[in-house]
């Protein structure tokens, strides 16, 4: 199963806000059994957001967006989603109740800007926001699933956590483990990584992440990961690949790891 992540917001493109949401969503979806095939960032513009949703629908089974669900003029995600799916944008009564109850508790007026957060594509299901006010949106379309989340990290994480059980890919497990290799330059370790990949072709993925200075104080974290239908199986594959890697690295520098 493939997943596609969309981050919406001018502040991301300007570099004013670091895109931690995409990293969190990608991590969660990977452990939920998905292959995250693409992450895109688009501005707060209807046509750009429509393009992103349609591109995601053409490539993946699950599309997750973050950002653009609030009450301001530049929060355009649900409008763009409705347009992308050729669906009517309507006031969702369940979402309206969620939004109204939040503001009733605060004792503030339910303005048109606040009611805006209850509009959704026809047939969408609102997802409660335990942290903020804007509900998440879940909809199934043409055999694909779409989840839109707020841009505020705490709100995004809370709604995603609640939605995760219904999103998880059944019978699909992911496991990864890392080993830190010291005193071997990444360029010298590269043949070892290549050899371990060759020995485990199609079974594991091995990726080196340099943490030190290549020439002076080389430190390389090597990540080994695998996916499969059995948790025990993928764990075993990863551990065997790490054993192979450490054995070969020690032939270069016995004190490396």
UniProtKB/Swiss-Prot annotation:
Gene3D superfamilies: MoaB/Mog-like domain
One Pfam family in the UniProt entry: MoCF_biosynth
InterPro entries given in the database record: CinA, CinA_Arc, MoaB/Mog-like_dom_sf, MoaB/Mog_dom
SMART domains listed in its UniProt record: MoCF_biosynth
Domain of life of the source: Archaea
Classification via PANTHER family: NICOTINAMIDE-NUCLEOTIDE AMIDOHYDROLASE PNCC (PTHR13939), NMN AMIDOHYDROLASE-LIKE PROTEIN YFAY (PTHR13939:SF0)
Family: Belongs to the CinA family.
The protein, known as: Protein Cmaq_1209
Organism the protein comes from: Caldivirga maquilingensis (strain ATCC 700844 / DSM 13496 / JCM 10307 / IC-167)
Taxonomic lineage: Archaea, Thermoproteota, Thermoprotei, Thermoproteales, Thermoproteaceae
């Amino acid at each position: 199963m493939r997943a596609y992540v969309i981050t919406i917001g001018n502040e991301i493109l300007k570099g004013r806000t670091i895109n931690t949401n995409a990293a969190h969503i990608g991590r969660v979806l990977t452990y939920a059994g998905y292959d995250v095939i693409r992450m895109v960032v688009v501005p707060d513009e209807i046509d750009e957001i429509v393009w992103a949703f349609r591109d995601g629908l053409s490539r993946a089974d699950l599309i997750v967006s973050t950002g653009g669900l609030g009450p301001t003029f530049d929060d355009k995600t649900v409008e763009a989603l409705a347009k992308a799916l050729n669906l009517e944008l309507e006031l969702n009564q369940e979402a309206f109740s969620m939004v109204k109850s939040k503001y009733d508790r605060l004792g503030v007026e339910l303005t048109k800007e606040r009611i805006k957060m209850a509009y959704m594509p026809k047939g969408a299901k609102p997802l409660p926001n335990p942290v903020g006010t804007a509900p998440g949106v879940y909809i199934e379309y043409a055999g694909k699933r779409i989840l839109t989340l707020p841009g505020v990290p705490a709100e995004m994480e809370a709604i995603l956590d609640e939605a995760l059980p219904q999103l998880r890919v059944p019978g699909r497990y992911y496991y990864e483990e890392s080993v830190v290799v010291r005193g071997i330059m990444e360029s010298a370790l590269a043949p070892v990584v290549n050899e371990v990949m060759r020995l485990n072709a199609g079974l594991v993925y091995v990726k080196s992440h340099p943490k030190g200075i290549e020439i002076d104080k080389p430190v390389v974290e090597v990540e080994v990961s695998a996916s499969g239908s059995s948790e025990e199986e993928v764990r075993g594959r990863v551990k065997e690949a790490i054993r192979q890697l450490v054995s070969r690295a020690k032939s270069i520098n016995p004190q490396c790891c």
